[in-house]
């Protein structure tokens, strides 16, 4: 990579923090080694064990953190019991406030996981529905409640769920009371925890008018409050626009980055980038997608790569292609994690930071990630620059990121 002299940033004062964000991603129930099932007992202050990670996050070149799910649930975190209470396996609301405060003091923005498509069965509205049935004031809070049906829990009624799992009860997003409640949750998270944004879980099945209501609330609660959505397939511009979300997860590039290296096929990567760039109107500010090579739902990149040396070009591309880069906790150390059929434990492990005390000096993966983070944060072309493909072959790929007449040239190979 090469760059001309530093550019004049006078014209970029209006840019938001997320335009230059480099994200670190934590799944806290996994990283802290929390029990798989919540007994709703006394809080255990596991979140406090993540405070030393804040310094590590900063020193490894990150200036933003996506952490979640965080709030009270019975199991993996996505079956919410209470949106306004930190999961008791992680601690108390005071612990979460202190954690966000420490991140902010280190110059790290924080976004939470917002699980607003569905609730768990222990959520107050569903408990009332179980108790009062047709007389419940919350009977219209959920989709397709049928009091003539039943389910494996023998509720005496059936309902729409997410993903075929009745543990995850789909909210009726057309109901104004539901919208008002969730918007109030967003306001609470800002006033209580000073959060900087939200990643919307299952955004690809959220109602668009519902998301627009969330966006209006986001615009009101805090300057530069960022809404990013989990979307797998489709035309991302349906979600990323002025009235809906600021960004979505870039699963299309995620797939191309690892398979393009395993198959020695940079055409797959370059054509994916071109297609995504065109979705945004051929301008970098059009779609600033949330780029990643692994996360809490997919296999670790170091496991997916057939040639482990490709860890380097994969991450060079992650940090230099249009979009917002993100690294999943532990992957900066090059750890492995295979996706298993009935368990995500191997991709959501507990880690002890002390075991990686010398990684910054001795671990080549960590050194690479830290160097790329520094480059990204000090090279504005990578955040704001136009993209232009310069050379493309099966095993070689070059492109430029240009801004105000100055360019960064990126060249990678997969030999």
Regions found by a protein language model. Give the residues of each.
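Loop/helix patches that line or flank the sugar-binding groove of alpha-linked glycan CAZymes
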Residues: 2-4, 16-20, 42, 271-275, ...
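Conserved, mostly hydrophobic/aromatic
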Residues: 26, 57, 67, 83, ...
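N-terminal structural segment of carbohydrate-active enzymes
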Residues: 2-112, 117-119, 124-128, 164, ...
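Aromatic- and acidic-residue-enriched segments that line the glycan-binding/catalytic groove
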Residues: 41-43, 76-88, 116-156, 216, ...
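The substrate-binding groove and active-site-proximal loops of carbohydrate-active enzymes
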Residues: 29-47, 79-93, 164-179, 196-205, ...
């Amino acid at each position: 990579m090469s760059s001309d002299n530093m550019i004049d940033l006078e014209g970029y004062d209006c840019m938001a923090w997320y335009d230059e964000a480099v994200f670190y991603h934590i799944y806290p129930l996994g990283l802290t080694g929390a029990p798989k099932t919540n007994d709703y007992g006394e809080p255990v202050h596991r979140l406090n064990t993540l405070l030393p990670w804040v310094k590590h996050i900063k020193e490894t070149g990150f200036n933003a953190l996506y952490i979640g799910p965080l709030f009270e649930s019975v199991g993996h975190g996505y079956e919410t019991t209470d949106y306004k209470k930190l999961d008791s396996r992680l601690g108390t609301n005071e612990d979460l406030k202190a954690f966000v405060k420490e991140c902010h003091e280190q110059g790290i923005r924080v976004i939470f996981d917002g699980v607003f498509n569905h609730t768990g069965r222990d959520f107050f509205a569903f408990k009332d529905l179980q108790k009062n049935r047709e007389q419940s004031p919350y009977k219209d809070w959920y989709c397709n409640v049928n009091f003539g049906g039943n389910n494996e829990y023998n509720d005496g009624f059936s309902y729409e769920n997410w993903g075929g799992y009745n543990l995850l009860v789909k909210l009726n997003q057309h109901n104004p009371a539901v919208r008002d409640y969730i918007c109030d949750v967003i306001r609470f998270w800002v006033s209580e925890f000073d959060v900087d944004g939200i990643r919307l879980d299952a955004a690809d099945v959220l109602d668009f008018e519902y998301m627009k209501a969330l966006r209006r609330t986001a615009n009101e609660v805090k300057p530069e409050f960022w809404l990013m959505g989990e979307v797998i397939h489709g035309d991302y511009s349906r979600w990323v626009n002025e009235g809906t979300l600021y960004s979505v997860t870039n699963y299309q590039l995620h797939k191309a980055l690892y398979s393009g290296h395993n198959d020695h096929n940079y055409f797959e990567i370059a054509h994916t980038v071109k297609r995504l760039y065109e979705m945004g109107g051929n301008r970098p500010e059009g779609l600033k997608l949330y780029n990643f090579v692994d996360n809490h739902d997919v296999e670790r990149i170091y496991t997916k790569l057939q040639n482990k040396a490709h860890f380097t070009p994969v991450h060079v591309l992650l940090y230099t292609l249009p979009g917002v880069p993100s690294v999943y906790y532990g992957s900066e150390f090059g750890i492995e994690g295979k996706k298993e059929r009935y368990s995500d434990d191997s991709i959501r492990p507990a880690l002890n930071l002390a075991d990686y005390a010398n990684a910054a000096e001795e671990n080549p993966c960590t050194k690479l990630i830290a160097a790329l983070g520094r480059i990204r944060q000090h090279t504005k072309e990578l955040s704001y620059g136009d993209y232009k493909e310069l050379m493309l072959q099966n095993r070689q790929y070059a492109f430029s990121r240009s801004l105000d007449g100055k360019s960064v040239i990126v060249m990678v190979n997969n030999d």
